[in-house]
């Protein structure tokens, strides 16, 4: 195999303020599940750096749940499609697909024999359905609510019971199969966000936006108590999860805390304060084996520490929004990956372990469009917030210095030796020296798009929407147009010099990469065809003999300079999402990022 996936650094859950986020547990206790965009992410609970991504939904996925057998996962999306797929093989073959109703699926529950599924959400005519997993035949009706149903659960022992919670401020109780509506529970005064049966089936709990948690008898539906008396939390409660032994309950709230309750004596055992900002609101939780997980509005997944509630054991960070750009850099003998996303967030990753964090302090406030590292070890990033930032990779702290404010929005930045950087903006080209603007071309006469600086530091190549690459010289503190045009095959989308400066690669919207030979006066060296859609990014391997291109066709090609026919094709590098950026860690390791908010490392062999 000329390529194989080496590592997957998965995205965070996609979260929305005021909406509960479901994290699915694994009956075997190894993994946990959540969704982001069109992806379902499976992660190892002991080592979250081990991840697998399922991308077969055509629409945004909302919820995914393991069957109690552990062999299948059911996932539901905003269009009302429910897919049931295999977990035992890497391919995740589809077993069944259903459309229980037209509209967003918000929660899924299985019976303990993995044979029946209940699905709820916001359909047009109905808000829920319960059916056999292998035929889709109905095994009851979910009625009794007049608004969207947020949550459903089924008692995991016979006789079966089913409970739902809805935006009509009510929970409902069903007996079955076939499941029939028994009664409505109107104890809450606000939306009911979550209902969950205890693993032994003796109790079920409901949690609501009114800050209350009520406990009921699992068999009869009679009210047992209100946790914490008058109020369980000072804010809305978005999620609850029972301990495996059914004695305790974990709750997650908009008051920025999670709590553990001892249900039998109705008391709080631990309170986990998660922070003071809006992003610290708790929207989801999972209690699996000894692990207590909660999800913050920031998308971060917190591993809670019962022995020290004030500080999580571990926080999984990363991106929850699409990644736009990436760069790599060796620091203290280790290779790090730096990725910048659509929301202005920059993350750094240890390329070996996947350990990652974001920079300290206040950084970009809008999409990070391009990043590169200069010779003094500073990360230079340009963003839609109209700034270029210089950030020390030793400190990894956004300092008040190191921000260059531009007149117009920058699109791309490239660095050369001697403290030079060239920024391409909308209708403007700016030369920076030692973090200061020293020259600009205000009306270049074409729309510049991308820029590369020759490793020698004297020549700048700028690609335009008009399909040409123009060459400029850096003379002291000015840029001089050399008057030389290199023709691409379409609007230029990226340009890159090889590390030895011998070649310039240019990719375009017409699906072609053209390589020019620098020593021969930029004569055309070779043309590379293969992509099925616009190419958006390029990166040269350190060996200067190979380069990679990524496109809107979800493909990555690794090309051989001397022979366009010798190529490695990575199909569906990021399935259903186009490749946004590429970089090489070494001659055989390629890193790709995409709008699926994940980072992947590939081993390439020639």
Swiss-Prot record:
Outcome of substituting residue 286 to V: In PFITS; uncertain significance
Gene Ontology terms, MF aspect: actin filament binding
Record: disease: Periodic fever, immunodeficiency, and thrombocytopenia syndrome: An immunologic disorder with variable manifestations including early-onset recurrent respiratory infections, stomatitis, cutaneous infections, and neutropenia.
Compartments reported by the entry: Cytoplasm; Cytoplasm, Cytoskeleton; Cell projection, Podosome; Cell junction
Result of altering residue 121 to R: In PFITS; uncertain significance
N6-acetyllysine, modified sites: 28, 81, 95, 115, 480
Tissue: Expressed in peripheral blood mononuclear cells (at protein level).
Name of the protein in its database record: WD repeat-containing protein 1
Alphabetized PANTHER family for the sequence: WD REPEAT-CONTAINING PROTEIN 1, WD-REPEATCONTAINING PROTEIN WDR1
SMART domains according to UniProt: WD40
Location of Phosphotyrosine modifications: 238
């Amino acid at each position: 195999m000329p390529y194989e996936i080496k590592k997957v650094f998965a995205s965070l859950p996609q979260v929305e303020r005021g909406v509960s986020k479901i994290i699915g547990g694994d009956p075997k206790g190894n993994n946990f599940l959540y969704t982001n965009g069109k992806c379902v992410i499976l992660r190892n609970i002991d080592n979250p750096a081990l991840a697998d991504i399922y991308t077969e939904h055509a629409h945004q996925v909302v919820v995914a749940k393991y069957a109690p057998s552990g062999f299948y996962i059911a996932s539901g999306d905003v269009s009302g499609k429910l897919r049931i797929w295999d977990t035992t093989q890497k391919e995740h073959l589809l077993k069944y697909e259903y459309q229980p109703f037209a509209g967003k699926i918000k929660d899924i529950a299985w019976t303990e024999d993995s044979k029946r599924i209940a699905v709820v959400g916001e359909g047009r005519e109905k808000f829920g359905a319960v059916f056999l997993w292998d035929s889709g035949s109905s095994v009851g009706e979910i009625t009794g609510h007049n608004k969207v149903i947020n949550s459903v659960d089924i008692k995991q022992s016979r006789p079966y019971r089913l409970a739902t919670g809805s935006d009509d401020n009510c929970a409902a109780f069903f007996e079955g199969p076939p499941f029939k509506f028994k009664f409505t529970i109107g104890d809450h005064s606000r939306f009911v966000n979550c209902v969950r049966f205890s693993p032994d089936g003796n109790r079920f709990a409901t949690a609501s936006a009114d800050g209350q948690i009520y406990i009921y008898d699992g068999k009869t539906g009679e009210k047992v108590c209100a946790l914490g008396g008058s109020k369980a939390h000072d804010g809305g409660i978005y999620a609850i999860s029972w301990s495996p032994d059914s004695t305790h309950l974990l709750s997650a709230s908009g008051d920025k805390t999670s709590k553990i309750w001892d249900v039998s004596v109705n008391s709080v055992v631990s309170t986990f304060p998660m922070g003071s900002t809006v992003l610290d609101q708790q929207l989801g939780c999972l209690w699996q084996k000894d692990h207590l997980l909660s999800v913050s509005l920031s998308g971060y997944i917190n591993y809670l520490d019962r022995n020290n509630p004030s500080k999580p054991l571990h926080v999984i960070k990363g991106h929850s929004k699409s990644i736009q750009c990436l760069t790599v850099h060796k620091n203290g003998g280790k290779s790090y990956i730096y990725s910048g996303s659509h929301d202005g967030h920059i993350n750094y990753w240890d390329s070996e372990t996947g350990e990652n964090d974001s920079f300290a302090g206040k950084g970009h406030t809008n999409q990070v469009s391009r990043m590169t590292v200069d010779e003094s070890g500073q990360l230079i990033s340009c963003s839609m917030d109209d700034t270029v930032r210089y950030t020390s990779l030793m400190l990894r702290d956004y300092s008040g210095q190191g921000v260059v404010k531009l007149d117009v929005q920058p699109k791309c930045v490239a660095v050369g030796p001697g403290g030079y950087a060239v920024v391409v903006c909308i209708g403007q080209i700016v030369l920076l020296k030692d973090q200061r603007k020293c020259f600009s071309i205000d009306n270049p006469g074409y729309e510049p798009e991308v820029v590369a600086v020759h490793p020698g530091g004297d020549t700048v190549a700028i690609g335009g929407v008009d399909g040409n690459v123009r060459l400029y010289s850096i003379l002291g503190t000015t840029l001089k147009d050399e008057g030389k045009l290199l023709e691409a095959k379409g609007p230029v989308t990226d340009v890159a010099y090889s590390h030895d400066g011998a070649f310039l690669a240019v990719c375009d919207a017409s699906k072609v990469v053209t390589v020019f030979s620098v020593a021969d006066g930029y004569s055309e060296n070779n043309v590379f065809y293969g992509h099925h859609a616009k190419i958006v990014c390029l990166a040269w391997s350190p060996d200067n003999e190979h380069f990679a291109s990524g496109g809107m066709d979800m493909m990555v090609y690794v090309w051989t300079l001397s022979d366009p026919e010798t190529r490695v094709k990575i199909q569906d590098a990021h399935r259903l999402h186009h490749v946004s950026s590429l970089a090489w860690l070494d001659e055989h390791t390629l890193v790709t990022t995409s709008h699926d908010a994940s980072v992947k490392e590939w081993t390439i062999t020639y």
